[in-house]
């Protein structure tokens, strides 16, 4: 679906559907008043009958409104006089998108500029959320359905903005389109079945991306190279599977050669049975989403490539399949990491930190400005923060603050958890330098503490997306595409875009 921005009068546009906001109590904004005047009071007459209360997201479709070039007018409730919050604004946009998808027209014009959104002064923030919501609503994953979804009639949406805000709105749509592309790619990878999406498949996806973009270099390290580098923890996770592990390195050079890169590290466990520490059978199908950290790094890179941001970015995808077998890692095994630290593996289901710790050590060679790892790491994060907010930890307050701010701006929020030294003691092992679990308490924090021991050479942050990477059960089940908006916003901010 194509999104464009124009600065024209709503009453003059020729379109299949014109969308106009109406407030509670039959209050008309400037656009609605102009449409009402052009239609000789048709809008007011409908509202007087009480057909639309004007609550946010309520809709009423009118056909053949006199005095207008639009075939239909869709009235949408915009609430009371005060500004809408992000959530209400997104719900309004999703409601409009839902109605438009059910209509026969190939285009629509949204005249929603009169609506104010709290904390979104100017046009950029408001139009960015609007565009992202509209584009996200167009996502369909039916690759394995014998009956595909009906082709959508709606091909183009025009967003109206006043002349003063036109440039900001256009920039917002440009950024939103890139983010939506990245989110769709992330969701596609996450939704693929694990018999298709394994480490070698992700490596092929990376190579395909490299062929499509000249400025992107791709290197794939196989299990032999992983072992040669001394990545004992990484190798241990995949040794029970017939699908060999892969470390995928993608290097984008959009900035000056002398500029230090940002590094994104993604956990890519393409299926997690728990290994010998086997998970319960109920809901295990959702462990195909354990690679959503890597998928979100892929998606963020897609957005960066589309926008051609003037930064240097290295993406490291730590991909393995965690399976039980005669050759699998056992609880009690001790491995030596690339850093030289030894790890006692008390629970083979705490495998994400094992592939990440060696990858974080590998990241040192790029002399990064900052390293951010993204992982569906702990069920404890879902207990602590639910499915609305990602967990965030780090060793640098400025970096953590930048990510928190990016999350707010992108409406893809994170919440900081502590990394106090007292938590480190829970990882003590009588037999190795460190244990891979820290007991039943503060599981998200102790996982972050584990990773912090391998990230002392640079500014580092860790995003635990166990609660936000996918939606469980119901008709909306599937990968969410998060935290692509947060990560892309962080990089947009660093690029000054």
Swiss-Prot record:
* Subcellular locations according to the entry: Cytoplasm
Q: Is-annotated flag, keyword Metal-binding? A: yes
Q: What residues bind Mn(2+) 1, as annotated?
A: 272, 349, 351
**Is-annotated flag, keyword NADP?**
no
What reaction is this protein's catalytic activity?
A: Release of an N-terminal amino acid, Xaa-|-Yaa-, in which Xaa is preferably Leu, but may be other amino acids including Pro although not Arg or Lys, and Yaa may be Pro. Amino acid amides and methyl esters are also readily hydrolyzed, but rates on arylamides are exceedingly low; Release of an N-terminal amino acid, preferentially leucine, but not glutamic or aspartic acids
Coiled-coil intervals, chain numbering: none
Q: Which positions bind Mn(2+) 2?
A: 267, 272, 290, 351
Q: Tell me the GO BP annotations in alphabetical order.
A: proteolysis
What is the organism lineage in this UniProt record? Answer: Bacteria, Pseudomonadati, Pseudomonadota, Gammaproteobacteria, Pseudomonadales
EC assignment: 3.4.11.1, 3.4.11.10
GO CC entries? cytoplasm
A Pfam family per the record: Peptidase_M17
The alphabetical list of record keywords is: Aminopeptidase, Cytoplasm, Hydrolase, Manganese, Metal-binding, Protease
* Cofactor (UniProt): Mn(2+)
InterPro entries, A to Z: Leucine_aapep/pepB, Macro_dom-like, Peptidase_M17_C, Peptidase_M17_leu_NH2_pept, Peptidase_M17_N
Q: Which PROSITE patterns match?
A: CYTOSOL_AP (PS00631)
Q: Name the active site residues.
A: 279, 353
Under Gene Ontology molecular function, one entry of this record is: manganese ion binding
Assigned protein family: Belongs to the peptidase M17 family.
- Function of this protein? Presumably involved in the processing and regular turnover of intracellular proteins. Catalyzes the removal of unsubstituted N-terminal amino acids from various peptides.
Q: Which Gene3D superfamilies did the record assign?
A: Leucine Aminopeptidase, subunit E, domain 1, Zn peptidases
According to its UniProt entry, this protein's organism is Pseudomonas entomophila (strain L48)
Protein name per its UniProtKB record: Probable cytosol aminopeptidase
Recite the UniProt cofactor note for this protein.
Binds 2 manganese ions per subunit.
């Amino acid at each position: 679906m194509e999104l464009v921005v124009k600065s024209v009068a709503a009453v003059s546009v020729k379109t299949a559907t014109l969308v106009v906001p109406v407030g509670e109590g039959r209050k008309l904004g400037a656009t609605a008043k102009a449409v009402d005047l052009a239609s000789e009071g048709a809008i007011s007459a409908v509202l007087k009958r009480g057909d639309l209360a004007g609550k946010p997201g309520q809709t009423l479709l009118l056909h053949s409104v006199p005095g207008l070039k639009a075939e239909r007018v869709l009235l949408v409730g915009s609430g009371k006089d005060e500004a809408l919050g992000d959530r209400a604004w997104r719900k309004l946009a999703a409601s409009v998108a839902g109605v438009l998808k059910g209509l026969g027209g190939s285009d629509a014009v949204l005249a929603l500029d009169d609506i104010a959104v709290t904390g979104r002064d100017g046009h950029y923030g408001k139009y960015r959320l609007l565009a992202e919501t509209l584009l996200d609503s167009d996502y369909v994953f039916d690759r394995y359905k014998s009956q595909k979804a009906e082709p959508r009639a709606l091909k183009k949406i025009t967003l109206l903005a006043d002349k003063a805000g036109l440039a900001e709105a256009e920039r917002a749509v440009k950024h939103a389109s890139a983010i939506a592309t990245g989110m769709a790619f992330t969701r596609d990878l996450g939704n693929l079945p694990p018999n298709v999406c394994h480490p070698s498949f992700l490596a092929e996806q990376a190579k395909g991306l490299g062929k499509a973009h000249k400025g992107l270099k791709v290197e794939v390290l196989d299990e032999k190279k992983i072992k040669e580098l001394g990545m004992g923890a990484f190798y241990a996770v995949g040794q029970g599977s017939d699908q060999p592990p892969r470390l995928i390195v993608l290097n984008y050079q959009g900035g000056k050669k002398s500029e230090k890169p940002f590094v994104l590290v993604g956990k890519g466990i393409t299926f997690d049975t728990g290994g010998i520490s086997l998970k319960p059978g109920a809901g295990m199908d959702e462990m195909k989403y354990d690679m959503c950290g890597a998928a979100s790094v892929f998606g963020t890179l897609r957005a960066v490539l589309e926008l051609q941001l003037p930064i240097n970015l290295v993406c490291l995808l730590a991909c393995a399949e965690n399976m039980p077998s005669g050759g699998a890692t056992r609880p009690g095994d001790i491995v030596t990491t690339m850093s030289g630290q030894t790890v006692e593996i008390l629970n083979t289901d705490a495998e994400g930190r094992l592939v990440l710790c060696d990858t974080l050590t590998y990241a040192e060679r790029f002399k990064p400005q900052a390293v951010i790892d993204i992982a569906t790491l702990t069920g404890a994060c879902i207990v602590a923060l639910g499915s609305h907010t990602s967990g965030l930890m780090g060793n640098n307050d400025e970096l953590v603050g930048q990510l928190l701010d990016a999350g707010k701006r992108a409406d893809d929020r994170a919440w900081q958890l502590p990394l106090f030294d007292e938590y480190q003691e829970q990882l003590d092992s009588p037999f190795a330098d460190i244990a891979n679990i820290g007991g039943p308490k503060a599981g998200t924090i102790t996982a972050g503490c584990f990773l912090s021991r391998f990230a002392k050479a640079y500014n580092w942050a860790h995003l635990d997306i166990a609660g936000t990477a996918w939606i469980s059960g119901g008709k909306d089940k599937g990968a969410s595409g998060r935290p692509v908006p947060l990560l892309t916003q962080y990089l947009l901010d660093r690029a000054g875009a």
